[in-house]
């Protein structure tokens, strides 16, 4: 019966996919929507720089007119009370196009023809038969400024005179509302004035929105340079950690996810802090989003600012180590000056140890490894002290912070602690730590693996899988997490449960069977775990479904946080989790030393190749190539001109790769 239901679910999903593609792949870096189809339509996207983040809400009405609302966040313009959500936020709906005169007459109508996304929001319109407009909306990379470029092109045979308004609007916030007093918010046009556009020629003008503290002035900024800097960042990200597979949708979704994963880092007075975003979470770090989800990914991307932010996050958490082994706070907020621990101990020490050990190994820097070792040790000892009588880790809650029940001990925390013990054994060996201590970590991991099976292993709703906590009798999305840490005792029943109609929805996994709530993070973990466990057939099927919906569906182009909470915000760390489906799932990359790792490539049956180019890590840049060779695969690891590994192996077998430094 379960197999029958799975076949029905797959059939339904295939039909749904065919109905949900609004967007199309465009050139090698973008997606495009033809705005003459499927009207009206509206969506929102978040874009970020070091000093600003923007949630842009755009709508195209039935008559092809455009409405744009920019919800702008200045994370370092702190408001009172200076809590998690205290970034200065303002919304703007100004439409400068409606202020333009063409041949002495105001524009009567704008017709949107298409919208392109490529790390920028580009809107193509016509203003009359002979005047084309291309808007490009983007955040500044390193200023507290949001920019818009307007390019007007005369497509006719006669010259056109346009008058572009000189907009200069300044407002000041109430001094008593700001941590540093009053803040100035400015809206300004550049290249304004009357200009004649000859046939087949173009002119450009710009609009900016800035937020500043006293003494700051960006009125003389060159907006074309700001756009070039944004393009430079996007180019840098596109040229590192490049995924190539026969499935262009997966390749493109991976490329987009790199953008969102990397752009949301804010230069706070407490150092660079990767922030989730979503109009709520900035200039702060969390043990799950940063320490666990995104930080272990940054070494492979080779994005130095991301690596700097990861190290900074662990350094901040290390400030809260204590001799009494009281919990490290879940979040360090307000540029590092305050904390949040409103959900108690969420298993945060397990999250931190898991991420810090993987990050230190992958970065391959002995100095960083030594610096993070005391934090990792402290977190491991904290978890050891939290073991209950059944040998699993007790905690007050989990990363969902009470939104769903998690009991007194949950599956996530113990699984993360298990992986942290495994990684710490590798790291300790690389750093030359006490062999007896490392033997103890290995012993603890083996005992914990047994305890996870004995305590959490259960038949839930007919599936041979896991209960999430004692007393849990409904399937939960997080039953996937043992698969991601190479615990495969119940992989068949767990994968069957994940892809059953009890859990799988058109938006991925429901948080709990029978509930409409979904959080992408658990779906992203699940897809990684399914590939890690070797079920490439179902893994690829559902990965395609998910990627097609997120990249080309109604709400694009990134993974999201959740629904209904937050209305599918483009939180940043989820994009890092998407990329980890490939690095750790399909390619099975697991760091085992400062210059070594294992690969367990899982080439899907319908693919003849898959590649990751310009992978960073272990103080190297290298390429991974997997080619089908009959019933086997050929795995090649190349670093520069050197072939590090080149063998024909069994698909799904594990190989050890060592760089000779």
Residue positions per predicted region:
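Active-site core of glycosidic bond-cleaving carbohydrate-active enzymes
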Residues: 286-311, 315, 370, 374-377, ...
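Proline-centered turn/helix-capping motifs that create local helix->coil transitions or kinks
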Residues: 265-268, 321-326, 384-394, 454-461, ...
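The feature captures the catalytic groove of carbohydrate-active enzymes
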Residues: 196-223, 279-283, 329-351, 381-446, ...
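Aromatic/His-enriched, Gly/Pro-containing loop or helix-boundary segments
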Residues: 134-137, 186-194, 330-346, 358-359, ...
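Bacterial Sec-dependent N-terminal signal peptides
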Residues: 1-20
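Glycine-rich, acidic and aromatic/proline-enriched surface loops and short helix-turn segments
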Residues: 255-267, 315-323, 352, 381-389, ...
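Conserved oxyanion/phosphate-binding beta-strand-loop segments in alpha/beta enzyme cores
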Residues: 109-119, 239-279, 483-484, 493-499
């Amino acid at each position: 019966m379960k197999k029958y239901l799975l076949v029905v679910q797959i059939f339904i999903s295939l039909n749904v996919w065919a109905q949900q593609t609004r967007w199309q792949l465009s050139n090698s870096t973008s997606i495009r929507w033809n705005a003459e189809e499927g009207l009206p339509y509206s969506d929102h996207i978040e874009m970020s720089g070091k000093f600003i983040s923007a949630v842009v809400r755009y709508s195209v009405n039935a008559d092809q007119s455009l409405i744009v609302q920019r919800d702008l966040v200045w994370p370092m313009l702190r408001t009172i009370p200076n809590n998690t959500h205290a970034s200065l936020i303002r919304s703007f709906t100004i439409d400068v196009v409606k202020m333009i005169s063409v041949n002495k007459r105001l524009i009567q109508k704008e017709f949107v023809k298409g919208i392109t996304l490529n790390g920028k929001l580009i809107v193509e319109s016509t203003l009359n038969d002979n005047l084309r407009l291309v808007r490009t909306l983007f955040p500044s990379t390193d200023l507290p400024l949001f920019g818009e470029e307007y390019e007007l092109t005369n497509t006719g045979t006669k010259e056109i005179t346009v008058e572009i308004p000189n907009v200069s609007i300044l407002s000041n916030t109430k001094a008593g509302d700001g941590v540093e007093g009053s803040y100035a918010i400015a809206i300004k046009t550049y290249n304004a004035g009357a200009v004649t556009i000859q046939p087949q020629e173009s002119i450009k003008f710009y609009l900016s929105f800035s937020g500043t503290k006293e003494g700051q002035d960006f009125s003389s900024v060159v907006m074309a340079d700001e756009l070039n800097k944004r393009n430079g960042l996007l180019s840098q990200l596109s040229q590192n950690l490049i995924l190539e597979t026969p499935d262009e949708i997966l390749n493109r979704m991976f490329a987009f996810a790199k953008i969102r994963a990397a752009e949301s880092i804010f230069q706070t007075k407490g150092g660079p802090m990767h922030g989730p975003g979503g109009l709520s979470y900035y200039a702060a770090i969390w043990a799950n989003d940063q320490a666990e989800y995104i930080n272990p990914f940054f070494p492979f991307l080779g994005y130095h600012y991301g690596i700097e932010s990861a190290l900074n996050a662990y350094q901040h958490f290390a400030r809260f180590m204590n001799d009494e082994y009281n919990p490290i706070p879940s979040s360090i907020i307000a540029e590092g000056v305050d904390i949040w621990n409103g959900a108690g101990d969420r298993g945060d020490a397990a999250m931190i140890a898991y991420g810090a050990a993987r990050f230190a190994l992958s970065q391959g820097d002995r100095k960083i490894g030594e610096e993070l070792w005391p934090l990792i040790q402290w977190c491991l000892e904290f978890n050891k002290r939290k073991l209950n009588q059944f040998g699993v880790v007790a905690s007050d809650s989990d990363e969902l912070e009470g939104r769903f029940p998690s009991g007194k001990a949950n599956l996530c925390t113990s699984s993360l602690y298990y992986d942290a013990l495994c990684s710490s054994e590798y790291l300790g060996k690389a750093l030359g730590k006490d062999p007896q201590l490392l033997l103890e970590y290995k012993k603890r991991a083996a005992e914990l693996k047994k305890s996870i099976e004995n305590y959490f292993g259960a038949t839930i709703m007919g599936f041979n899988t896991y209960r999430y906590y004692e007393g849990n009798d409904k399937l939960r999305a997080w039953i996937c997490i043992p698969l991601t840490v190479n615990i495969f005792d119940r992989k068949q029943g767990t994968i069957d449960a994940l892809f059953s109609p009890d859990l799988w929805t058109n938006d991925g996994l429901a948080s709990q069977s029978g509930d409409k709530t979904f959080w992408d993070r658990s779906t992203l973990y699940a897809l990684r775990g399914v590939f890690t466990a070797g079920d490439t057939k179902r893994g690829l099927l559902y990965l395609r479904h998910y990627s097609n919906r997120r990249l080309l569906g109604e709400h694009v182009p990134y993974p999201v946080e959740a629904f209904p909470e937050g209305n599918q915000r483009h939180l940043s760390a989820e994009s890092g989790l998407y990329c980890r489906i490939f690095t750790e799932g399909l390619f099975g990359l697991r760091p085992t030393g400062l210059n070594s790792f294992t690969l367990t490539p899982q080439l899907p049956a319908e693919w003849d190749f898959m590649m990751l180019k310009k992978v960073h890590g272990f103080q190297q840049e290298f390429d991974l190539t997997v080619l089908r060779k009959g019933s086997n695969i050929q795995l090649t690891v190349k670093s520069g001109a050197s072939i590090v590994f080149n063998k024909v192996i069994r698909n799904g077998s594990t190989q050890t790769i060592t760089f000779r430094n």
